[in-house]
Swiss-Prot record:
<dbReference type="GO" id="GO:1990351">
    <property type="term" value="C:transporter complex"/>
</dbReference>
<dbReference type="GO" id="GO:0140318">
    <property type="term" value="F:protein transporter activity"/>
</dbReference>
<dbReference type="GO" id="GO:0016558">
    <property type="term" value="P:protein import into peroxisome matrix"/>
</dbReference>
<keyword id="KW-0067">ATP-binding</keyword>
<dbReference type="InterPro" id="IPR003959">
    <property type="entry name" value="ATPase_AAA_core"/>
</dbReference>
<comment type="subunit">
    <text>Interacts with PEX1; forming the PEX1-PEX6 AAA ATPase complex, which is composed of a heterohexamer formed by a trimer of PEX1-PEX6 dimers.</text>
</comment>
<keyword id="KW-0547">Nucleotide-binding</keyword>
<dbReference type="GO" id="GO:1904949">
    <property type="term" value="C:ATPase complex"/>
</dbReference>
<dbReference type="InterPro" id="IPR003960">
    <property type="entry name" value="ATPase_AAA_CS"/>
</dbReference>
<keyword id="KW-0378">Hydrolase</keyword>
<comment type="similarity">
    <text>Belongs to the AAA ATPase family.</text>
</comment>
<feature type="binding site">
    <location>
        <begin position="763"/>
        <end position="770"/>
    </location>
    <ligand>
        <name>ATP</name>
    </ligand>
</feature>
<protein>
    <recommendedName>
        <fullName>Peroxisomal ATPase PEX6</fullName>
        <ecNumber>3.6.4.-</ecNumber>
    </recommendedName>
</protein>
<dbReference type="GO" id="GO:0005524">
    <property type="term" value="F:ATP binding"/>
</dbReference>
<dbReference type="GO" id="GO:0016562">
    <property type="term" value="P:protein import into peroxisome matrix, receptor recycling"/>
</dbReference>
<dbReference type="GO" id="GO:0005829">
    <property type="term" value="C:cytosol"/>
</dbReference>
<comment type="function">
    <text>Component of the PEX1-PEX6 AAA ATPase complex, a protein dislocase complex that mediates the ATP-dependent extraction of the PEX5 receptor from peroxisomal membranes, an essential step for PEX5 recycling. Specifically recognizes PEX5 monoubiquitinated at 'Cys-6', and pulls it out of the peroxisome lumen through the PEX2-PEX10-PEX12 retrotranslocation channel. Extraction by the PEX1-PEX6 AAA ATPase complex is accompanied by unfolding of the TPR repeats and release of bound cargo from PEX5.</text>
</comment>
Length: 1021
């Protein structure tokens, strides 16, 4: 790419132009007269991390001198009366841009009404004239404003940018709102609130906001000196600078009454996304005004040379977990020294100084290694505080001062207490490129709201001198549901110190006799040196089950004593430190709440369950992971979400998955996207981005389910459709009434009317009960959770009932979901008739009844289907209304038409010979054939056809070898000689007749009469 000067033109044309000198640099020597138009790609410096590349149609402009490119201002709706970006990167595009398949244009409401009165041809003509669209010439892109404020391009398919062919490109017009006009208004100098006779003001009270990322030097006008203190740069619109009467690059003072700081202000060049009524500063400046939303900005009248140089400066570490770890100290102090001495820094007493470092590299860091150029990836941040400042003759300094590495003596000592800035006020995470943390919308995540309220209340009590000794237990029935993320996010949002200890990583001779003492002592050692300097703080003990055991499953007396001792010691630890250090909150997390002993739970004031995300919560999680900042965090390639991605559909497809599964899905989708769009030219037409589409995400979701669903027991949507089932039309209608109504019209049941959630299929074996249950799940997009009786049994007392509870909990986590109990009579037989010594089956039935009772009221989106051959063996309580209250008999087809429908469903994917008549075949079948018998009939017919064709192939091979004097094997014959006809299998009528002749019905006529008697008995009762 070539660095070129950039100018914007006010003409309504969509053509760019380049100077002859730039053209020669890009394409080689130019002829005297350039007769054709060409294309160049332009990349503007950006105030965000995500700059896009534009391809524009260009011409040669002989009036431009030097390396200059001129862009139409409409390309970014640039207000020409404000300072503009004057540099860009330009590259020649030597191939013709692709033609777009479709373009979606949003049209202002009133204009849309007028356009609908025109023919399609006149509509295109209007857009062509007003938008300066050249047929197969002008490059358009998503987000482009054709003419302000009336038309904007919403989407381009299949690329981000390309050509419009009026004959091939489909143009869709969408009606916009009348608010488009206000949205498109440009913020230029005409928006200034200065009267004609009014001069600039000395002071301006304005909103102070934190920059989301450092500003690149190409956007600093005028260019800053290399030794300028860039941590004191602030940025504002030209309107703000004009009102203050200062020029870009001037010194200003920021003050909130109690605090005052010197800064250097630069104008925000257009185009940019910043608000014109705010001033933007770095985290180092914003943190000193953490209590103020607005600051007073005024011109600084002094000179930098007048600021005194300190003779000695004492800097203290701000107490935090990272600042207390010895392994980090070398790299932290090295980075602190580099930060202070790299520029002509200006400091104040009590200034907070941020220092970032690479925690992964800290253990290998040394002074010798620091002499080499190492690519660090800073992932952590600590704060330092300017404690005492002395000038010459030991005179204390209370104002601004400078540090000269040749004169100033720096001393780091002591540890001071200061809370980290709240992320809502000072977004240091985004600015320094630290790993982002999911922000919980407390309107959607009710458990996050409760946890946030608990921590907020505890902090307020501490600020008012009350020590409430808060302890919280976060628990879940599934792993990786976001308990640690919840704690980190809340602490960052509120500005509270976090001391995080993963108990799974503690292993101080775990098998030794005094393991309890070692573990508790290690926890105390980790926190007791930090807590005195971090009030208020949260001590987070993750994976509590890692150091605890379930007491009722321990048979060894010594181990039982150790387990009880561990619970008592941890409870004592909570009490000791919450009393010794007011404002300390202990938060524990576990995936097995039943392992936590009563000694700990009695000391825990709050227990919060963190469930598997609901569909609404998964929408929030997907939206966050697919946002530009998170999607491109630490990514070598730039990714973006395509317009065909529907977050709500992704949330529906990912039922039952945890946040870590969703993160894995997005990462897999990025891999799929990269493999699909490796070519450089493909990237060019996508604006420098790789767009993740819905197919990438759907493939990633299916892959995640295939890999993890069986191992973790996650329900998934099967793949059985109504077309795969024949002869059960009456039953389908009953199912639609039971399941489809609550899903489509939940408001009908909001008034308190109980819905029917349980269906029981009964009848002879092989009549399609399991297949029908899967078809229900598939056609209503419900997850399918199949339960077998032996899976529920466990040798320990109470565990079998717990397994029943876990089944229903996993199904609730995967709503909407169908729980299918196959062979229900083995799971829930009549109570009192079993001979098991512990009464396990009776307790399972009782637990199943209790779970079913909860479905009619709190089981929205949860359905239970049972299947049995012997409904007379079921416990009668299961069949009362509110449980399995819908009994559907799936019998044997009693008409030839139903039998023919079954045959059509089973042979749907067969290649049938014209002589095959399924109606005639059904007419020859007795009425004792079940669905399974018909399946066997079709399978045997296919096998007969394959055997017949295999015999024909053997004859063809032998005949060919004799005729051509060859010795081909069957495999060689298929590789060299065989045609498509030889490899296709066509099932003939004779194959069906042979299969029917050999088929033995699975249900005799006597057995069928027995099932009919059972049906009559149930229907009459």
């Amino acid at each position: 790419m070539v660095i070129a000067n950039l100018v914007f033109s006010a003409s309504g044309t969509s053509l760019a132009s380049v100077s002859r000198e730039l053209y020669c640099t890009l394409f080689g020597p130019a002829p005297d007269e350039l007769k054709h138009e060409f294309y160049v790609s332009v990349q503007l410096p950006s105030y965000s991390r995500h700059a896009k590349t534009y391809v524009v149609q260009s011409t040669l402009n002989e009036t431009l001198e030097g390396q200059v490119v001129q862009l139409p201002s409409k390309i970014e709706d640039v207000p020409l009366d404000t300072p503009l970006i004057d540099l860009c990167k330009v590259e020649a595009v030597r191939e013709r841009p692709p033609v777009l398949e479709s373009v979606t244009i949003e049209v202002h409401g009133s204009l849309y009404e007028e356009l609908t009165k025109l023919s399609e041809e006149d509509q295109l003509r209007f857009l062509q004239i007003r938008g300066d669209l050249r047929d197969c010439g002008t490059v358009v892109r998503a987000g482009q404003k054709l003419f302000v404020p009336w038309c904007q391009i919403l989407d381009c398919v299949p690329y981000y940018q390309g050509l419009i062919d009026l004959q091939r490109t489909r143009i869709l017009l969408l009606k916009g709102t009348d608010a488009m006009e206000s949205c498109h208004l440009r913020k230029g100098l005409e928006d200034l609130k200065l009267r004609p006779n009014e001069g600039p003001t000395k002071e301006l009270r304005i909103m102070l906001r934190c920059l989301e990322q450092p500003i690149e030097r190409a956007l600093l006008v005028p260019a800053a000196d290399t030794d300028d203190d860039d941590s004191l740069f602030v940025f504002a619109s030209a309107a703000v600078l004009l009102r203050l009467g200062v020029t870009s690059g001037a010194r200003v003072t920021l003050s909130d009454g109690a605090t005052s700081r010197i800064a250097k202000v630069f104008v925000l060049l257009s185009p940019n996304h910043f608000d014109s009524d705010a001033i933007y500063a770095t985290p180092r400046l914003v943190v000193n005004f953490a209590e103020a939303d607005k600051v007073v900005v005024s011109k600084y009248e002094g000179e930098m040379a007048e600021l005194p140089v300190a003779s000695s400066v004492s800097i203290s570490r701000v107490g935090s977990w990272e600042n207390s770890q010895m392994v980090y100290q070398k790299i932290i102090l090295n980075n602190l020294t580099n930060f202070i001495t790299a520029k002509q820094r200006i400091f104040y007493k009590d200034d907070l100084v941020p220092v970032t470092f690479d925690s992964d590299f800290s253990a290998m860091f040394s002074d010798q290694l620091n002499e080499f150029s190492v690519d660090y990836h800073d992932d952590s941040l600590v704060w330092f505080k300017i404690d005492t400042v002395k000038l010459n003759d030991d005179i204390p300094c209370e104002g601004a001062f400078r540090i000269d590495s040749k004169v100033t003596k720096l001393v780091t000592c002591n540890v001071s207490s200061s809370p980290p800035p709240p992320l809502s006020k000072c977004d240091y995470v985004s600015y320094y490129g630290l790993e982002p943390c999911f922000g919980y919308d407390r309107r959607v995540f009710d458990y996050a709201k409760r946890f946030h309220d608990i921590i907020t209340t505890s902090r307020k009590c501490f600020q008012h001198g009350m020590n409430v000794g808060t302890t919280v237990m976060l628990h879940s029935s599934s792993v990786s549901v976001g308990k640690t993320t919840l704690v980190r996010s809340t602490c960052r949002e509120l500005g509270i110190h976090l001391i995080e200890i993963d108990l799974l990583q503690l292993d101080p001779h775990m098998n030794s006799s005094n393991s309890t003492v070692n573990i508790v002592a290690l926890i105390r050692a980790k926190i007791e040196n930090v807590l005195p300097h971090t009030a208020p703080s949260v001590v987070y003990l993750a994976h509590l089950e890692g150091v605890l055991e379930k007491e009722d499953q321990i048979s060894d007396p010594a181990s039982l004593k150790a387990a009880k001792s561990m619970g008592i010691e941890l409870a004592k630890l909570f009490t000791d430190y919450t009393e010794l250090y007011p404002g300390t909150v202990f938060v524990c997390s576990t995936d097995a709440l039943d392992v936590v002993p009563e000694a700990i739970r009695s000391k825990t004031k709050f227990e919060i369950e963190v469930p598997v995300p609901t569909e609404t919560q998964r929408v929030e999680i997907f939206s966050w992971y697919l946002s530009p900042d998170v999607l491109n965090f630490n990514a070598s390639q730039q990714f973006a979400m395509d317009h065909d991605v529907t977050i709500s559909r992704l949330a529906l497809q990912s039922a039952g998955l945890t946040p870590i599964d969703i993160r894995s899905i997005v990462e897999s989708a990025k891999v799929c996207c990269y493999q699909r769009s490796k070519e450089k030219q493909h990237m060019l037409w996508q604006g420098g981005y790789r767009y993740i589409n819905s197919a990438d995400l759907s493939a990633a979701i299916n892959k995640a389910r295939d890999e993890f669903s069986d191992s973790i027991g996650a329900p998934k949507i099967p793949n059985v459709f109504w077309e795969d089932i024949g002869g059960l039309e009456m039953v389908k209608g009953e199912i639609l009434d039971t399941i489809d109504m609550p899903l489509k019209f939940p408001e009908l049941f909001a008034s308190g009317m109980k819905k029917r959630s349980g269906i029981l299929f009964y009848g002879p074996p092989g009549t399609g009960k399991t297949l029908l249950a899967k078809a229900v799940a598939t056609n209503f997009s419900l997850n399918f959770f199949s339960v077998k009786g032996p899976e529920l049994l466990n040798m320990y007392i109470g565990e079998s009932e717990a397994n029943v509870r876990r089944v229903f909990q996993r199904a609730r986590d995967a709503k909407p979901c169908v729980i299918f109990f196959d062979e229900l009579d083995s799971v829930a037989p009549k109570r009192g008739n079993q001979g098991d010594s512990g009464g396990v089956m009776d307790r399972i039935v009782s637990q199943l009844l209790a779970e079913l009772d909860g479905l009619s009221t709190g089981g929205d989106g949860l359905f239970v289907i049972g299947a049995t051959n012997r409904p007379d063996l079921l416990d009668e309580a299961l069949l009362r209304p509110g449980r399995f209250d819908k009994l559907l008999y799936l019998g044997i087809s009693d008409t030839n038409e139903k039998q023919a429908n079954i045959l059509r469903a089973l042979t749907r994917k067969f290649t049938l010979d014209p002589d095959v008549s399924l109606d005639d075949l059904a007419a020859s079948c007795p009425f004792t054939y079940t669905g399974a018998d018909f399946y066997a009939l079709c399978s045997d017919a296919m096998l007969n056809a394959m055997t017949r064709i295999a015999g024909n192939v053997d004859e063809k091979v032998a005949s060919y070898n004799r005729a051509h004097n060859k010795n081909y094997s069957v495999r060689q014959w298929f590789d060299v000689i065989a045609t498509a006809e030889d490899t296709s299998i066509t099932v003939c009528m004779q194959d069906f007749v042979k299969a029917q002749r050999e088929l033995v019905p699975s249900v005799s006529e006597g057995e069928l009469n027995h099932y009919l008697a059972i049906r009559d008995n149930f229907e009459s009762s």
